Amino acid sequence: PQSIEHYLEVLDAFIEREITPLENQDDNIRFFDHRREHARTDWDRDGLPSEEWETLLTEMRRRADTAGHFRYALPEAYGGQNGTNLAMARIREHLAEKGLGLHNDLQNENSIVGNLMTPMVLHDFGTPEQQSRWMEPMLTGALGWCFGLTESAHGSDATWMETRAERAIHNGVSGWRITGEKMWTTGLHKASHVLVFARHSGHQGSASGIGCFVVPTDAAGFEVG
């Protein structure tokens, strides 16, 4: 559709005006040229992303959000533009075609038009109270979120998982007790909450009986190995 092609022109103008100058400022280009892996990595913290790299990404997202692009896929009620799947596919293709840069980096899913998987999950399946409490802080970065799906014995096949959720009462409060382990939980080092996928019913190999649980990283029993 022509409306999508026009929006690509709007994005290109924004990149030229706001993002490219930031990319070239203070040798930030080191995060995208042949030095990028070393520049992005804090080797003294077991290979976590460097603070300088994450600070730059935060500023990119702030500028994109201020300009109205970062939340494109979300409904207008959350500052988005009701972006369709078709539009998102075309935008990602266009930005990737421009090459590696601060505007778009498929290596770590950062882009001026956010691939907002976690907010979309909360919007589509969360309760109104959850949306009111977490959606905006999640989008601004005030709260860090990630998700736990992959397990060492089963990969990302979510129909086979050993993580279990059972109803329980703790200190008089009804909830869930989750037991299991996850791996490759990108972003956990700064996350306040994790979306943990666990089986609460059904049998291994079944697509039903799997739930997604919001788990605070300071919850009792939560450990990072």
Question: Residue locations for each model-derived region?
Answer:
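Amphipathic, small/basic residue-rich leader segments at the start of a protein or domain
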Residues: 1-112, 129-133, 137
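Short, solvent-exposed loop/turn elements at beta->coil junctions and helix N-caps
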Residues: 77, 150-154, 183-184
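N-terminal glycine-rich flavin-associated loop
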Residues: 106-129, 155
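Short beta-alpha junctions and helix-cap segments that line functional grooves
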Residues: 134, 161, 183, 224-225
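A short, Trp-centered hydrophobic/proline-enriched beta-strand micro-motif
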Residues: 141-149
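Active-site-adjacent elements of ketosynthase-type condensing enzymes
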Residues: 153-162
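A structural signal for short hydrophobic beta-strand segments in well-ordered beta-sheet cores
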Residues: 163-167
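A short core secondary-structure module
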Residues: 174-175, 179-224
